[in-house]
Amino acid sequence: MADLTKLVDELSSLTVLEAAELAKLLEEKWGVSAAAAVAVAAAPAAGGAAAAVEEQTEFTVVLANAGDKKIEVIKEVRAITGLGLKEAKDLVEGAPKPVKEGVAKDEAEKLKAQLEKAGAKVELK
């Protein structure tokens, strides 16, 4: 039990950026997505079949490849996400990675166009 208390204390002392990075690392390690878990938990049990027929309303903008203009893509990723230079560079170099999750279709298409204009290959999921 003392180990769990120590772990809770350490997690409580993380900054927001450190907590976000921890979430990304855990998603990669366990092969899950925090956004998907929230969507599944929020879906009603009886309306599962009806929800599958409805059009997708939330999208994840995924950077598939940075292309040849990596610096331009890093600048766009920073502008879109508000990440620092190192975090944006790590995201671009670690492609394929999600840039933004849970966005509306029109915003997702706008972000895709921005990133593609900078030279990136982008997917919407």
UniProtKB/Swiss-Prot annotation:
Molecular function terms, GO-annotated: mRNA binding; structural constituent of ribosome
* A Pfam family this chain is assigned to: Ribosomal_L12
Matches recorded under InterPro entries: Ribosomal_bL12 (IPR000206), Ribosomal_bL12_C (IPR013823), Ribosomal_bL12_C/ClpS-like (IPR014719), Ribosomal_bL12_oligo (IPR008932), Ribosomal_bL12_oligo_N_sf (IPR036235)
Name a single GO cellular component.
cytosolic large ribosomal subunit
Q: Which domain of life is it from?
A: Bacteria
Which UniProt keywords are present, listed alphabetically? Ribonucleoprotein, Ribosomal protein
Is Ribosomal protein found in the keyword set? yes
Q: Name one GO biological process term.
A: translation
Q: Which residues cross the membrane?
A: none
**Main role?**
Forms part of the ribosomal stalk which helps the ribosome interact with GTP-bound translation factors. Is thus essential for accurate translation.
Q: Which family does it belong to?
A: Belongs to the bacterial ribosomal protein bL12 family.
- Tell me the NCBIfam families matching this sequence: L12
Q: Which proteins does it associate with, and in what oligomeric form?
A: Homodimer. Part of the ribosomal stalk of the 50S ribosomal subunit. Forms a multimeric L10(L12)X complex, where L10 forms an elongated spine to which 2 to 4 L12 dimers bind in a sequential fashion. Binds GTP-bound translation factors.
The protein here is known as Large ribosomal subunit protein bL12
